[in-house]
UniProtKB/Swiss-Prot annotation:
It is found in: Cytoplasm. SUPFAM superfamilies: YhbC-like, C-terminal domain (SSF74942), YhbC-like, N-terminal domain (SSF75420). Its main location: cytoplasm. Required for maturation of 30S ribosomal subunits. The lineage of its organism: Bacteria, Pseudomonadati, Pseudomonadota, Gammaproteobacteria, Enterobacterales. This is Ribosome maturation factor RimP. One of its GO terms (biological process) is translation. Keywords: Cytoplasm, Ribosome biogenesis. It holds the Pfam family RimP_N. InterPro entries: Ribosome_maturation_RimP, RimP_C, RimP_C_sf, RimP_N, RimP_N_sf. GO terms for cellular component: cytosol. Belongs to the RimP family. The gene is rimP. CDD domains: YlxS_C.
């Protein structure tokens, strides 16, 4: 997680939790049209109204704190079926589930991996890929998503 994303998480978590939702994670995607994407969840699921409420509250806080120096779009959504994974707790919650990982730095000449989450030990996760256990540092994971099965 970048320094900006850490700061944004600190700023955003209080208003999200005050509304009764879990802040699953955030992504700040830089580009011609930069986007701040906020993922929220709750035991009862997420509605469009919930996303609108969080967007309104977070937008007000971001206007005051002003941590982002470029123009951006704010998106608030549920994690969806291909839920993004941001923390060790997320991996622990989904032990035994299939995940796709994109690494910052390649391991064994690969940046993209897919397998079953086997274990979490501090800041390291073990994923079984093609029958072999591979260990990944959370700090080297650029993006991770659950693989939905229908």
């Amino acid at each position: 997680m970048s320094t900006l994303e850490q700061k944004l998480t600190e700023i955003i978590s209080a208003p999200v939790e005050a509304l009764g939702y879990e802040l699953v994670g955030i992504e700040f995607i830089r580009g011609r049209q930069s986007t701040l994407r906020i993922y929220i969840d709750s035991d009862d699921g997420i509605t469009v109204d919930a996303c609108a409420d969080v967007s309104h509250q977070v937008s007000a806080v971001l206007d005051v704190e002003d941590p982002i120096t470029v123009a951006y779009n704010l998106e608030v959504s549920s994690p969806g079926l291909d839920r993004p994974m941001f923390t060790a707790e997320h991996y622990t919650r989904y032990l035994g589930e299939e995940v796709t990982l994109v690494l910052r730095m390649a391991m064994q000449n690969r940046r993209k991996w897919q397998g079953i989450i086997k274990a979490v030990d501090g800041e390291m996760i073990t994923v079984t890929v093609d029958g072999k256990d591979e260990v990944f540092a959370l700090s080297n994971i650029q993006k991770a998503n659950l693989v939905p099965h229908f």
